[in-house]
Amino acid sequence: MVPVIALVGRPNVGKSTLFNRLTRTRDAIVGDLSGLTRDRQYGEAKWQGRTYILIDTGGISGDEHGMDEKMAEQSLLAIEEADVVLFLVDAKAGFTAADQMIGEHLRKRNKTSYVIANKVDNIDPDMARAEFAPLGMGDAIPIAGAHGRGITQMLEIALSEFPKDDADEPEEGEEEIVAEGEEAKRIPGPSEKDGIKIAIIGRPNVGKSTLVNRMLGEDRVIVYDQPGTTRDSIYIPFERNDEKYTLIDTAGVRKRGKIHEEVEKFSVVKTLQAIKDANVVIFVMDAREGVVDHDLNLLGFALEAGRALVIALNKWDGMQPSERDYVKTELQRRLFFVDFADIHFISALHGTGVGNLYQSVQNSFKSAVTRWPTSRLTQILEDAVGEHAPPMVNNRRIKLRYAHLGGANPPLIVIHGNQVEKVPKSYVRYLENTYRRVLKLVGTPIRIEFKGGENPYEGNKNTLTDRQVNKKRRLMSHHKKADKKRRDKR
């Protein structure tokens, strides 16, 4: 399971600055889910082969009534979700009563916590450690979050208990948290035991629980239910038509066969982890509410992760034709960025259209993991360039030479050529659409990566042999004599 780190502390101690620095290699997945997470911000970061989820919380002022109320509700939830808590204090402001109360609460929670003394610019680190020793939480780790100093030591300590990602290596530039770009995550195909992993995600009360129970209907073959911790999703292996699947349910534990929908506790951490572990994501929306901003934020999670996607509009039954037409228009207008995904109009309660989801899951997964030979991908590239050549840059044509497969789920196509760093975004979209059309990809995003061709002889002088030098001398002498004769005739 991906470790979760929460940043807590008083207002203006530098939590957001540290959050932005740590997530710079992969920008914050979502800024604020208003109404769902309020003051919590979630991002994904990576450090020396370890991927982790980072939570930035609102400040805790310490002037509320009673300790449980003094801790802001969202910060409390973040602490409960986290594996590790980084308790930020302001080294310039010094030790405060609010720091004392927050520290006491963390000690009571028996949560792995570290005191981070931020803003130690021009402050003796030993003095900062001594200043916050009364917290009784061990030596404070001094950092300067705005400048990146001390972050290496902080992350080494915070992540020391967690294993590295499978087959991952540290990324270049991580030591100073300044590397840019991102590495698309690759996941293996379905195991013989688990089958295709399907994550059911969506806002609270859109029908996720009902859909899960409908998909695990009378013809199900449940192998086992494996509940996790309070923040873990439920993994439910089952079979349908001799095909194996594993449902990743973020809605929580429920009684077998319970169909009615209850108010669900929404957890961004559950959603992020479910998406990360899934092969295919079924995104559930409430057709009667249409497309809302929270839907777009959650779809951004799946798109960022590159997972195969199927969209299910639930509660379609009972809607008037005019209402249905309006919803379809809204889908085309607001979900254009996921136009590759199949959309199903269903009623999880009555089962209408639910069975059709499986075919889309199969098709999406097949598109996401199919492998094509280099010759096939290169031919598609050549045809695309022949039909619509790349633009000129500084009077030189961008040259795209060949393509090969770089990864799966999502498909990553690596294109080699010259001046590839100058390929405009519009042409990248043209290539994406071409590959999607020719390869008949459905339900999966596609990513294109460019690699420039290096000239192995660049900077090298051509060294002539003795024979070439003599030949060059004779030719020069011949040209000089010919020029002299022409001048004499004039």
UniProtKB/Swiss-Prot annotation:
Keywords: GTP-binding, Nucleotide-binding, Repeat, Ribosome biogenesis. Residues 166-181 have a biased composition (Acidic residues). Residues 182-191 have a biased composition (Basic and acidic residues). Coiled coil: none annotated. GTP 2 binds at residues 202-209, 249-253, 314-317. Gene3D superfamilies: 3.30.300.20, P-loop containing nucleotide triphosphate hydrolases (3.40.50.300). Residues 370-454 form the KH-like domain. It holds the Pfam family MMR_HSR1. One of its GO terms (biological process) is ribosome biogenesis. GTP 1 binds at residues 9-16, 56-60, 118-121. Residues 164-191, 452-490 are annotated as: Disordered. InterPro entries: G_ENGA, GTP-bd, GTPase_Der, KH_dom-like, KH_dom-like_a/b, P-loop_NTPase, Small_GTP-bd. GO terms for molecular function: GTP binding; ribosome binding. Residues 470-490 have a biased composition (Basic residues). The keyword Oxidoreductase does not apply. It comes from the Bacteria. Associates with the 50S ribosomal subunit. GTPase that plays an essential role in the late steps of ribosome biogenesis. NCBIfam families: GTPase_EngA (TIGR03594), small_GTP (TIGR00231). Belongs to the TRAFAC class TrmE-Era-EngA-EngB-Septin-like GTPase superfamily. EngA (Der) GTPase family. HAMAP family: GTPase_Der. This is GTPase Der. It comes from Pseudomonas fluorescens (strain ATCC BAA-477 / NRRL B-23932 / Pf-5).
